[in-house]
């Protein structure tokens, strides 16, 4: 199990006021929600770094509000544009690209790092934060999917701790509080089922990108919303759970729970299950991580179980949504397969979002990439990045498109 803050009864930063934050991915859904939590409790936090990749205008607005000493963007063109948008007399240090984000994750003045970049692009920063002993509020599940073993070793060596921001893993973290890890029998992740729950493969053949982006419960970014629709998001979370909690792949179950009220469950050896319930709003998990071990008002509507009504559960449809089993296969086989899985998925989702492939092409592209993998097993971050890039290039070439995406 990765070293968690719960293992440290009195961490020295517990009483730090304000807590110093580096928010990587500040312009995305998670980052924006995190800043709403910060704004609601300004005396508790000091924002020292913000990184926003491509959304320079939004980053400039955030920077003008919070005045951090450090900002991060994707490239030099974005940096130049950002400088033009910043208020007169405000001249923060601007970091560029994955290496710049990694530098921001290791800033001495940043005690807590929110890793909320989308996809494999967040790996370098998460790995750097783990090496430097930071408190990591982890929303970037891909970091553990790609390099879970490496990050675990870094945490053990540096004293870094990880708090999971994903609602499901945050729910598990809370359900584990006060219990002996040896008493855990299994972990049960809940999935909303996405916008296409109950649809057959035949029905899915004609769904559009707009249909897939209409998530019934959660307000998320485009990529994770598509992953939710295909059940790949749950597949990635299954792999993440194995790394976070030190459990085997067969000890992580998945049930579809359309109401998204029960965020996940832990089953213990005595047969009991502890569930975490709440309104489907990411601010709950974000606030929990940012203020642990304290608890603050997250600013979300209170859950009323009477108004919520019935809570239902069902098995996932693995025939219509095979991505969940593809993720399980990748983890079981190892040998770099999780890297291939993630890279192929990111390319396929990008192609779908730009209307260049159909919805059902996504799992087909991923399955072909897994079948073609030559067994290369990366042992360091550079090897992971090389396999990621090679997989993306191959998938784009087979799809008849140029490679315009990557870990940057």
Swiss-Prot record:
Cofactor(s) the protein requires to work: Mg(2+); Mn(2+)
MF GO annotations: 1-deoxy-D-xylulose-5-phosphate reductoisomerase activity; manganese ion binding; NADPH binding
PANTHER family found in the cross-reference section: 1-DEOXY-D-XYLULOSE 5-PHOSPHATE REDUCTOISOMERASE (PTHR30525), 1-DEOXY-D-XYLULOSE 5-PHOSPHATE REDUCTOISOMERASE, CHLOROPLASTIC (PTHR30525:SF0)
Protein name (record): 1-deoxy-D-xylulose 5-phosphate reductoisomerase
Enzyme Commission designation: 1.1.1.267
Signal peptide: none
Family named by the database record: Belongs to the DXR family.
GO biological process: isopentenyl diphosphate biosynthetic process, methylerythritol 4-phosphate pathway involved in terpenoid biosynthetic process
Keywords: Isoprene biosynthesis, Manganese, Metal-binding, NADP, Oxidoreductase
InterPro entries: DXP_reductoisomerase (IPR003821), DXP_reductoisomerase_C (IPR013644), DXP_reductoisomerase_N (IPR013512), DXPR_C (IPR026877), DXPR_C_sf (IPR036169), NAD(P)-bd_dom_sf (IPR036291)
Reactions the enzyme catalyzes: 2-C-methyl-D-erythritol 4-phosphate + NADP(+) = 1-deoxy-D-xylulose 5-phosphate + NADPH + H(+)
Keyword Ribonucleoprotein among record annotations: no
Pfam family, one: DXP_redisom_C
Binding locations of 1-deoxy-D-xylulose 5-phosphate: 141, 167-168, 192, 215, 228, 233-234, 237
Class of this enzyme: oxidoreductase
Organism: Nitratidesulfovibrio vulgaris (strain DP4)
